[in-house]
Amino acid sequence: MGSLIFNANEVFEVAKRIERNGIAYYTKAAELMKDEAGKKLMIELAEMEAVHEQIFTHMQKSLSSEEHAEGLIDPHNDAFQFLQGMADKYVFNPKEDPMKVLTPGADPKTILDAAIEREKDSIIFFEGIKAMVPEKFGSKRIDEIVGQEMGHIIILTRHRDKV
């Protein structure tokens, strides 16, 4: 496969995938929660992820043609598949049972702490991927994704501090 190089468009596609995985994770967690407060919080977190996906879609539309860099040589789409696999495994794993992380009846603070950890994982993921996006293919745009994730942590932390 050789060394992996990504463009900003591919990273935005994966950012949206992570948000969709988050929606599925929190929706499933809501179904499994025994108490109403926990269910409500999971639904709110899923809704936040949906808004985030829309933000990334909007940001992606503003990418330049170079940031789409469709001329990268990757006939089997190996690089993008690698990127998707990493996102699925290390941020929100769509196959993971939320109850392995969240116990039924978990208090809202514990639930929010788990959500904050997921957001931190996404920041680490994007910071690592940024090194594989050449500047001409939009590496600086990855900072915009990280900024959005940091903003999400701030919102979740404020929410947690209120409970």
What are these regions (language model features)?
Residues 1-163:
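Non-heme di-metal
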